Swiss-Prot record:
Gene Ontology annotations for the cellular component aspect, listed alphabetically: plasma membrane; proton-transporting ATP synthase complex
GO molecular function, one term: ATP hydrolysis activity
Catalytic reaction annotation: ATP + H2O + 4 H(+)(in) = ADP + phosphate + 5 H(+)(out)
Protein name, as recorded: ATP synthase subunit beta
Family annotation (CDD domains): ATP-synt_F1_beta_C (cd18110), ATP-synt_F1_beta_N (cd18115), F1-ATPase_beta_CD (cd01133)
Source lineage: Bacteria, Pseudomonadati, Pseudomonadota, Gammaproteobacteria, Enterobacterales
Enzyme Commission number(s) of this protein: 7.1.2.2
Quaternary context: F-type ATPases have 2 components, CF(1) - the catalytic core - and CF(0) - the membrane proton channel. CF(1) has five subunits: alpha(3), beta(3), gamma(1), delta(1), epsilon(1). CF(0) has three main subunits: a(1), b(2) and c(9-12). The alpha and beta chains form an alternating ring which encloses part of the gamma chain. CF(1) is attached to CF(0) by a central stalk formed by the gamma and epsilon chains, while a peripheral stalk is formed by the delta and b chains.
Amino acid sequence: MATGKIIQVIGAVVDVEFPQDAVPKVYNALEVEGTTEKLVLEVQQQLGGGVVRCIAMGSSDGLSRGLKVTNLEHPIEVPVGKATLGRIMNVLGEPIDMKGPIGEEERWAIHREAPSYEELASSQDLLETGIKVMDLICPFAKGGKVGLFGGAGVGKTVNMMELIRNIAIEHSGYSVFAGVGERTREGNDFYHEMTDSNVLDKVSLVYGQMNEPPGNRLRVALTGLTMAEKFRDEGRDVLLFIDNIYRYTLAGTEVSALLGRMPSAVGYQPTLAEEMGVLQERITSTKTGSITSVQAVYVPADDLTDPSPATTFAHLDATVVLSRQIASLGIYPAVDPLDSTSRQLDPLVVGQEHYDVARGVQSILQRYQELKDIIAILGMDELSEDDKLVVSRARKIQRFLSQPFFVAEVFTGSPGKFVSLKDTIRGFKGIMNGDYDHLPEQAFYMVGTIEEAVEKAKKL
């Protein structure tokens, strides 16, 4: 193993000089010697003259010029397989849950090729989430990719936790959760939530939180993905949750600037599309097994045309858009039924009835949206009888799209509800057909099935 020495440290970027005949390859891992904490660097550029520019996977505090660095001669490798279940690991696959070594049988490099075209497979099976608005408007496909888009504080992480809880309990497969640049508190809450719902032994957790250097946050998504790929290649259907994909992009922006690349639109890295592609192309299903992924996507300043969310859109099968306006009405989950889409919402996949009900719900809500201006200026009395009926049904639908969550029981004080797709379609079909025109709209707020709304109306 060749050794070199540090010649320059600029924040998270470290330049290391090696002998001319032993320059490490790009993406090779290097280990710094003589530091109290283990520090791994990843080669990003070869500058010539035996010098390589690297990003640090940990804090570069206390590094000095002249420290010895060893070339490990392979990319960063992490534990994979069943030994990782129920454990919390960092970007290097080291345990951070104080439960001793992982005891893995195999380690895989985090940089891997995406599967070839011949190996790819797609599926039309639906994954039932038990969340009414998602199952109805933007159904998820098994082996598909779902994005949860939303600005700050509209409920991406809570929706993600509810999805994990529902799917992990209903679907008995394995899941991998990658916490990319999110709050440590959320990671902690998440761990306890998994423990309480008794699904921790089916989940591998990989965390690279907000306080970590950019190199760490840039690679932690790949660490989680590598663990998911191992389960997929063993022939399993695995779930991959990434919270938050925007922080992956942001870490790339930080690293790109430190490496001296010219910024592109809005200050993002010039390699934005390629970096996103490298990650997303690997999140796919093959003939052996499937990876179903749910990714939270932070939308800066609620602007969906920002280059980061816009680049992510292209890779997804279903997009769940969370709206600040709906959250301000107190309707949770704050999913915008007119902005959310899914490739599965096709009569050939979901069936004619589901398709008609979903499109019917959207058209009623769209009509209500158009009438809002008239109501604001002239008042409800100026509407025709038909339009009054549309408004009344739209307001009921809007409230019926809300639902109490299991993971939010502490905040709402009402028990969570899992609603089957069959019940969801039946409920919305009834509202559209006017079967519940006699009930007050408050009865539809924060209930599960339509029967609960009828019961609630009796108490009002």
